[in-house]
C-alpha cells in the first residue's frame, strides 16, 4: 500500500510538470516581442505580479520559515528565473515610460519583500508562526490573481464565443488546480487548499463555458488575436505547496 507521503510526492511531481509548463506558456508572446522588437500593447503587470508571488513562496519554503520544503523553493526559484527573463525582455523593448514604471513597481516589490523578511525573521520565532504569516500573504496574493479569469469568462458569455479562451489552456489550468488541491488534501494544508481549490473551480467553469459556447464561436479566419489567459501556478513542497500567479499570453488564430 502506498503511504500518504509517497502519494503526495507523486502528485507533487505531476504538479511540478504542469506548473513548469504553465510558466513557459508565455514564450510565444515573448518570441513575438523579440522578433518585432516592440512590446506593442502587452503589459508587464502580470509578470510583475507573478514575480512577487514566486518571491513569497521561495521565502515560505526556506528551512528557517518552513522546513522540509525544498521543492517549494525549486519550482518557485525556476519561476523567478523565468519571470525575470520575461521582464528583462519586456524592459529591453519597452519605451522609457514603461521602463520607469517597471522599475518603480520592482522597487516597491523588493521593499515589500525586505519588510516581510525582516518582520517575519525578527518578529516570529517559531516555524509555525513564520509559516502562518508568510502562508497568509501567499494565499492572499494568489487568491486575488485567481479572480482574474472573470474578465475572460464575462467576455465569453457576452460574445457567446470561446475564441478568447483556448480549450487546452483552460484544461491545463483546471488540472493544475485539481492536482495541487489533491496534494494539499493528502496532508491537509490550508495555505495550499484555498488558492488551488479556487483555481480548480474557475478552471471547471471555463471548461463548462467552452462546452456551452464552442458551437457558437465564429469560424477561424486569418486574423490573429492576442489573448491573455490568467492562471495561477503552483509548485510542490515536502510539507506545503508554493503558489504563484501568472497570466499566460497566447495567440489565437481567428
Curated annotation (Swiss-Prot):
Kindly list the GO molecular function terms attached to this UniProt entry. sugar transmembrane transporter activity
- Where is the protein situated, by its record's location annotation? Cell membrane
Q: Which residues form the MtN3/slv domain?
A: 10-98, 133-216
Q: Where are the transmembrane segments?
A: 10-30, 46-66, 70-90, 102-122, 132-152, 166-186, 190-210
Spans within the Extracellular topological domain: 1-9, 67-69, 123-131, 187-189
Q: Does the record carry Ribosomal protein as a key word? A: no
The record's Gene Ontology cellular component field reads: plasma membrane
Q: Which UniProt keywords apply?
A: Cell membrane, Membrane, Repeat, Sugar transport, Transmembrane, Transmembrane helix, Transport
For this chain, the family text in UniProt reads: Belongs to the SWEET sugar transporter family.
Function field: Mediates both low-affinity uptake and efflux of sugar across the plasma membrane.
- Name listed for the protein in its UniProt record: Bidirectional sugar transporter SWEET6b
**What organism is the protein native to?**
Oryza sativa subsp. indica
Amino acid at each position: 500500500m502506498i503511504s500518504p507521503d509517497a502519494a503526495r510526492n507523486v502528485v507533487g511531481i505531476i504538479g511540478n510538470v504542469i506548473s513548469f509548463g504553465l510558466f513557459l506558456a508565455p514564450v510565444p508572446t515573448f518570441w513575438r516581442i523579440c522578433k518585432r522588437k516592440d512590446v506593442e500593447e502587452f503589459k508587464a503587470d502580470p509578470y510583475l505580479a507573478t514575480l512577487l508571488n514566486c518571491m513569497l513562496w521561495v521565502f515560505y519554503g526556506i528551512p528557517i520559515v518552513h522546513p522540509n520544503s525544498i521543492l517549494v523553493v525549486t519550482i518557485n526559484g525556476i519561476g523567478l528565473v523565468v519571470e525575470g527573463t520575461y521582464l528583462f525582455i519586456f524592459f529591453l523593448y519597452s519605451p522609457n515610460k514603461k521602463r520607469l514604471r517597471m522599475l518603480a513597481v520592482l522597487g516597491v516589490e523588493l521593499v515589500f519583500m525586505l519588510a516581510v523578511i525582516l518582520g517575519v525573521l525578527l518578529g516570529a520565532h517559531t516555524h509555525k508562526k513564520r509559516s502562518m504569516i508568510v502562508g497568509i500573504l501567499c494565499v492572499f496574493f494568489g487568491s486575488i490573481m485567481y479572480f482574474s479569469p472573470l474578465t475572460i469568462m464575462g467576455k465569453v458569455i457576452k460574445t457567446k464565443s470561446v475564441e478568447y479562451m483556448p480549450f487546452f489552456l483552460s484544461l491545463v489550468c483546471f488540472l493544475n488546480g485539481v492536482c495541487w488541491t489533491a496534494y494539499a488534501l493528502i496532508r491537509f494544508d490550508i495555505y495550499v487548499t484555498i488558492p488551488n481549490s479556487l483555481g480548480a473551480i474557475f478552471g471547471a467553469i471555463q471548461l463548462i463555458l467552452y462546452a456551452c459556447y464552442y458551437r457558437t464561436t465564429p469560424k477561424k479566419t486569418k486574423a490573429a488575436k492576442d489573448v491573455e489567459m490568467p492562471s495561477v501556478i503552483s509548485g510542490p513542497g515536502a510539507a506545503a505547496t508554493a503558489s504563484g500567479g501568472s497570466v499566460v499570453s497566447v495567440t489565437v488564430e481567428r
